[in-house]
Amino acid sequence: MKAAIALSLLGCVFGFSGKAFAGDAWGPCTPADGTTYHYNVDVDVGIPDAAKNVAGTVLPDVLNWSNGQNVSLICECPDSYKNEKDTLVQGVSMLPPSGRTVDSMKYYTLTEELEVATNIRISTSVYGFVPFKNQQALQTTGCNKVITTPYMGGAGLLSFAITKPFIGDSVIPLTLIAELYASKTNKDYGTIPISSVSIQGRVTVTQDCEIKPGTVLDVPFGEFPSSAFKNRQGQMPEGATEQEINLSFDCNNISDGIKVALRLEGATNADDPRAVDMGNPDIGVLVKDSSGKILVPNDSSSTTLLNLSSLDSKTHRNAAIRLLALPISTTGKAPKGGTFEGVTTIYLEME
């Protein structure tokens, strides 16, 4: 009898057919090939009105993407699932929330200068504002078979918000912004996204400030005996004087109220990071604004403002700034003799 019972049970195992799921453990859809499809969206947005280049400006639906690429997914359902229902879609943001909501759309931090809101097309006429859940994908139906659809990240709209004004381009590196999941129930979307959406490119404001032709950028300090630097750490060598640097700019599309700040970047002296490196460890150059404030290279908070004129045409205004440069001893030692020079790069930023 024991042998007969064992054979009977074995027969029950091999005789069972169809799909069964424990409890509610069914519903999530997965990519047909097991691999999430990645949509990459190129961003090239222009802002012709420079007055919009201020913190808080919202640029709704400025990019509409549609690449026509279908994705394939499969949704497994139990045999008891007789009445076909629309596939449900969930859109998850992969960015930190910024706290901004405009017209029911949530914005997320994209870069230091931009936030983004994403609106993904999930059927012919239905869009999901990321984040969303339990949205019906009306054209995506079927159970236990491969479903092919363009409405899973292949089209959508992007909106941007400016958090910090910028000059020229605000570059967006390749950034994952959203993932899409699908399910036949609203209880479980699984852990494997059907698709993802990444963006890269730039938002451009047609405004700039350029150095006027003929502006002198070389600053000669003259010749000094090595002894002039000795025991004068942080001070100019004996006989040295501050040299003026007068910079003039042509600025276009800089609207009233916008401030343009100047800062420095470049190699600095190892013993005094305030000083521009001059190729000699005992010598450096400090750059100051007209008020005497030292502009520390590579310090984003160490800035000074350009003096902007009023508009002299519809889009143009002049800008100028007076800086002072002075050589110093960075160690108090007598430097070795030679000819030395240094380079620093000027950057302009909107405020």
UniProtKB/Swiss-Prot annotation:
Q: What organism is recorded for this protein?
A: Escherichia coli O157:H7
What does the similarity note say? Belongs to the fimbrial protein family.
Signal peptide positions are 1-22
Give a short account of what the protein does.
Answer: Part of the lpfABCC'DE fimbrial operon. LP fimbriae may participate in the interaction with eukaryotic cells by assisting in microcolony formation.
Please give the GO cellular component terms listed in this UniProt entry.
pilus
Output the lineage of the source organism.
Bacteria, Pseudomonadati, Pseudomonadota, Gammaproteobacteria, Enterobacterales
Q: Which SUPFAM superfamilies match?
A: Bacterial adhesins (SSF49401)
Transmembrane feature ranges: none
Q: Where in the cell is it found?
A: Fimbrium
Q: Its GO biological process terms?
A: cell adhesion involved in single-species biofilm formation
Give yes or no: UniProt keyword Ribonucleoprotein: no
InterPro entries found in the cross-reference section = Adhesion_dom_fimbrial (IPR000259), Adhesion_dom_fimbrial_sf (IPR036937), Adhesion_dom_sf (IPR008966), Bact_Fimbrial_Adh_Pro (IPR050263)
Keywords, ordered alphabetically: Fimbrium, Signal
Q: What is this protein called?
A: Probable minor fimbrial subunit LpfD
The organism's superkingdom is given as Bacteria
Kindly report the protein's main subcellular placement as a broad class: other
The induction comment states: Induced during the exponential growth phase.
